[in-house]
Amino acid sequence: MKLKTTLGLLAGRSSHFILSRLGRGSTLPGKLALQFDKDILQHLAKNYEIVVVTGTNGKTLTTALTVGILKEIYGQVLTNPSGANMITGITTTFLAAKSSKTGKNIAVLEIDEASLSRICDYIQPSLFVITNIFRDQMDRYGEIYTTYNMILDAIRKVPTATVLLNGDSPLFYKPSIPNPVQYFGFDLEKGPAQLAHYNTEGILCPECQSILKYELNTYANLGAYICENCGCKRPELDYRLTELVELTNNRSRFVIDGQEYGIQIGGLYNIYNALAAVAIARFLGAEPQLIKQGFDKSRAVFGRQETFHIGDKECTLVLIKNPVGATQAIEMIKLAPYPFSLSVLLNANYADGIDTSWIWDADFEQITDMDIPEINAGGVRHSEIARRLRVTGYPSDKITETSSLEQVLKTIENQDCKHAYILATYTAMLEFRELLANRQIVRKEMN
């Protein structure tokens, strides 16, 4: 082993040991190790079978559900549970790894789309999974085709890896890669071909660029698409969801390839994440019973429908970061059978995306159909989100705004309503969780 690698391992593992004893999570160990040896990740990851999960929405939950299943088989699975998905975070994850008791080293990693190509210079995944690609942080990623090409460039570096794609996305039709490809998707009852919502991106035929129609449109640009001009249509699915048995704001049940599964997480969009997890598990040889056991133990993860109590109020924290994700979160809370207060926390830091114009493309108009007695607009850009909420027609006198997340917390604590939803952009979610953790309402880290 090279001296620089030895020094990098010493610096990284020592700092991780100290930080863990202090109860602090950080990507500092990875950053320190990489300063000694920029290739250290290659050394750390060389004996692992690696599954990479990437895409715009659903990475964290898909990864968590997959890890839950694989733990039923291997007992121990390396992962990055708090969503530290850039190279310093991935390196930190491997530095913290413990020896496998089964002799099988397996890692399931969510990786940021823009970081994937760089990371794939140092790791050799056996499976890539792309959940979806939607418009997200335009100032960082650019438009959807730019993001997709970044991911494909990374995948081409590992031509032996299988690629598991959301077959319901037209973007993923016949990707220009040498890798073997498999698809998962919804195979529910189809109807007459119709256009998607007028504000939907990524609906051009991948063959002739005509506007696609959908015989089944689950949400956004996903579903059983067909081109009436050239006949292009969704590819055959290798893993098929054939029935929605139950769908609520906090759980769902569904049938995939003849087996019924359930998760204690609400919303249609999260069923796609469960479908991806099933597809990964089946690809790796997991039997349906073990998948069910993994799902039965699954719970919401780090800011993604994470539930807790503020006083006697049952609260749910939901990450939002782009128009499609926010709209699906709103669709999910709309399923709640009880009144609830709503807090929407908008920041505009680098990790959130500095351009906040995306809030105008999210379907906040649905809140006027819900039993919401009061709304808190919070975060650095509280005035912008307050303005967006007023435009929906929701009564202005029921909207309060503040830059102080501490004040948002106090408002929830003092409200009459017994339920609360908090929709927050990434750094606002982290800041709000830190407030909660300091009060010992939630744990600082979710492992």
Regions found by a protein language model. Name each.
Residues 1-15, 19, 24-26, 202, ...:
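ATP-dependent carboxylate-amine ligase
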Residues 2-204:
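Phosphate-binding loop of NTP-binding sites
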Residues 62-63, 118-119, 139-140, 173-176, ...:
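Short glycine-/acidic-enriched loop or helix-start segments at secondary-structure transitions
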Residues 66, 70, 90-94, 274-284, ...:
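Buried hydrophobic packing segments
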Residues 76, 126-127, 161-162, 180, ...:
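Residues at the starts of beta-strands that form the adenosine-phosphate
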Residues 110, 131, 164, 273, ...:
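Residue-level signal for inorganic ion chemistry
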Residues 185-323:
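Adenine nucleotide phosphate-binding catalytic loops in nucleotide-utilizing enzymes
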